[in-house]
């Protein structure tokens, strides 16, 4: 599905000020409404997303309302050679999730999953 109007392909920006009611502290509820950040990490709700990404120093956005298709919370610098290709938003093919997640972390949240499988060749 195409992204909603007003959203960029790289996810939607969140107005985190609405959760930051106590100056520098966030007042988040335990309400489960998962969102997926462009860093490919699932956050339990939008407020937790704001709280946990505020100090990352780069513009992590919400990629989708729901859990991430590809979760990059647990990944290794050393990747196996398994071949389960993923197509990145940069048009490059990544041989597996580990290599894709390393590229996501290297891009500081700018890279996201375009689709499972290989990118279309020109």
Curated annotation (Swiss-Prot):
GO terms for molecular function: serine-type endopeptidase inhibitor activity. The record marks 30-31 as: Reactive bond 1 for trypsin. Disulfide bonds join 16-50, 28-47, 36-68, 72-101, 79-98, 87-119. Keywords: Disulfide bond, Protease inhibitor, Repeat, Secreted, Serine protease inhibitor. GO terms for cellular component: extracellular region. Residues 10-70, 71-121 form the Kazal-like domain. The keyword Nucleus does not apply. It is found in: Secreted. Coiled coil: none annotated. It comes from the Eukaryota. The record marks 81-82 as: Reactive bond 2 for elastase. Its main location: secreted. The keyword Transmembrane does not apply. PANTHER family: OVOMUCOID-LIKE-RELATED, SERINE PEPTIDASE INHIBITOR, KAZAL TYPE 2, TANDEM DUPLICATE 1-RELATED. This inhibitor is composed of two homologous actively inhibiting halves: one which inhibits trypsin, the other which inhibits elastase. This is Double-headed protease inhibitor, submandibular gland. The lineage of its organism: Eukaryota, Metazoa, Chordata, Craniata, Vertebrata.
């Amino acid at each position: 599905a195409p992204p909603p109007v007003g959203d960029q392909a790289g996810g939607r920006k969140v107005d985190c000020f609405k959760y930051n009611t106590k100056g520098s502290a966030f007042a988040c509820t335990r309400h489960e409404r998962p969102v997926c950040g462009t860093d490919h990490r699932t956050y339990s709700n939008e407020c937790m997303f704001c709280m946990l990404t505020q100090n990352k120093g780069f513009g992590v956005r919400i990629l989708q309302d729901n859990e991430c298709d590809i979760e990059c919370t647990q990944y290794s610098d050393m990747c196996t050679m398994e071949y389960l290709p993923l197509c990145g938003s940069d048009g490059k093919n990544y041989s597996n999730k580990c290599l894709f997640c390393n590229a996501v972390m290297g891009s500081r949240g700018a890279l996201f999953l375009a689709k499972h499988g290989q990118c279309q060749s020109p």
